[in-house]
Structure formats: structure tokens, C-alpha cells
């Protein structure tokens, strides 16, 4: 049983949220907030029946997150996943695979490294134990495909990277190297080919389906190459000068 005495200057909202999280992890209502200003009423509030220990005494070791997991596994040994209230710093990330385009904006902004990618394949990976439920990934997602689920996963799966979403990569039409996401490249081709000034011709539209190296090579040899300068003048040789001499 835990009693927390609040001082007049204590921020109630923060303490109440933390107490609610602790109740959820412990699986009981043994945490009580005492918000009493009258000394006589305080004496009455503190004189309560002493509760029996919920578990044998143990020595918690590790970080705060590790201690929280230890408390959950000790107080709720049968539980695998404990649902937590909103604003809890533990939880999972849910991805709408139909909306996700694997742009990986969430990966670049994840402060704890809970979200990751695969350098070889279009994949979005997630490690639940590292997630802080900060909400940056959900806010930055341009497709609104990410939602947060506050929970405490007590299984070993929380320490492993799981694939939340993956798709087939696109093969370059010139060299065959894999790049990007197949569905995204096909969607961009459908929207731009023949409908945008830069991709009006079929040859220009093919550049969308090329890797970065092949795209530069194709653009360099195109007739309307924007990088091309003026035609170089012909090199003058001694024959040009001899041809202008009258005695030649």
C-alpha cells in the first residue's frame, strides 16, 4: 500500500497521471493520493488499516524502464501485456499498411531509435521496449498512418525488432538495381507520365522508373539536356591556315 501526500504547490495533473500508470502496472488500487490541507483531517486520512505486502521483498536493479517492467512481471506474473492509460511512456506503434507509403519520415525523427528501417529492403521496423510514446512519428506522418497504443509488453518480443510494414522494391528498367517502393514508383508514374511538362514524352517518363545513376545518364544524353552548354567550336588546325594562303 502506497500513500502519496500532496503539498499545496504540487501539480495535481502530473501526479494523478503517474498514479494511474502505477495502478495499471500493479493491477490493484493500492496507490492513494492524499490531498488534505486540514491537519486534523490529515491525521484521520493517514490512520488506515495496514495492507499486507503484495510480494516478497526484492531489490530492483536497472533503469527506470527496467524497474517498471520488473514491477509489472512481479505484481502481475500471469500478464503478458498490460494496458496503460494515455500519456504513459510505454507502448506500441500501430501502422495502417494501406495508407503507409514507407517514406520513413518517422524513422528519421524517432528520438529513441524505436523505429528503424532496412537498408536493403523497403521495411519499417519497430522495437517496443525503446518506444517513449512521444508521438513525433504520428505527428510527422504525411499519410496519418500511425497511431499509438499505450501498453507495457512483458514478453521477450518487446526487445526484438518486428516488421510493421514492408513492400516489394522497384527494379530499375535500365540496370535492374532495386530502389524505392514498387507501389510508390508506379503511382508516381501514373500521375506524372504524359501529364506533367517534365515528363510529357515517353522517354522522359521512363526516367521516373530509373535509379539515380541511370536517370542522370539518360538525362545527360537527352536532346533537351538542361546541363548541356553551347556547341563547342571546331578546333582550328594548320590546314585551315594553309588553305587561306594564295600560294597554297
What positions do the PLM features span?
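Ferredoxin-type iron-sulfur electron-transfer modules and their immediate structural context
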Residues: 6-17, 23-120, 130, 140, ...
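Charged, low-complexity interaction segments
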Residues: 1, 201-248
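Accessory beta->alpha helical hairpin/"wing" motif in late/C-terminal subdomains of nucleic-acid enzymes
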Residues: 125-127
Amino acid at each position: 500500500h502506497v500513500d502519496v501526500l500532496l503539498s499545496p504547490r504540487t501539480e495535481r495533473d502530473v501526479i494523478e497521471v503517474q498514479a494511474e500508470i502505477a495502478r495499471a502496472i500493479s493491477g490493484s488500487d493500492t496507490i492513494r493520493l492524499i490531498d488534505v490541507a486540514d491537519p486534523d483531517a490529515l491525521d484521520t486520512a493517514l490512520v488506515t488499516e495496514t495492507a499486507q505486502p503484495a510480494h516478497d521483498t526484492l531489490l530492483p536493479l536497472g533503469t527506470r524502464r527496467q524497474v517498471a517492467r520488473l514491477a509489472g512481471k512481479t505484481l502481475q506474473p500471469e500478464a503478458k501485456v498490460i494496458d496503460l492509460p494515455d500519456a504513459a511512456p510505454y507502448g506500441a506503434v500501430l501502422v495502417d499498411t494501406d495508407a503507409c507509403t514507407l517514406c520513413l519520415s518517422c524513422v528519421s525523427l524517432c528520438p529513441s531509435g524505436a523505429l528503424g528501417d532496412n537498408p536493403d529492403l523497403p521495411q519499417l521496423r519497430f522495437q517496443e521496449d525503446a518506444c517513449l510514446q512521444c508521438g513525433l512519428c504520428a505527428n510527422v506522418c504525411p499519410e496519418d498512418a500511425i497511431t499509438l497504443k499505450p501498453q507495457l509488453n512483458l514478453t521477450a518480443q518487446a526487445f526484438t525488432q518486428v516488421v510493421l510494414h514492408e513492400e516489394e522494391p522497384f527494379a530499375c528498367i535500365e540496370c535492374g538495381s532495386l530502389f524505392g517502393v514498387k507501389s510508390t514508383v508506379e503511382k508516381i508514374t501514373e500521375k506524372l507520365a504524359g501529364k506533367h511538362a517534365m515528363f510529357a514524352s515517353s522517354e522522359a517518363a521512363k526516367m521516373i522508373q530509373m535509379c539515380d545513376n541511370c536517370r542522370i545518364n539518360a538525362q545527360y544524353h537527352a536532346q533537351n539536356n538542361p546541363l548541356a552548354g553551347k556547341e563547342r567550336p571546331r578546333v582550328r588546325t594548320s590546314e585551315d591556315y594553309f588553305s587561306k594562303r594564295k600560294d597554297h
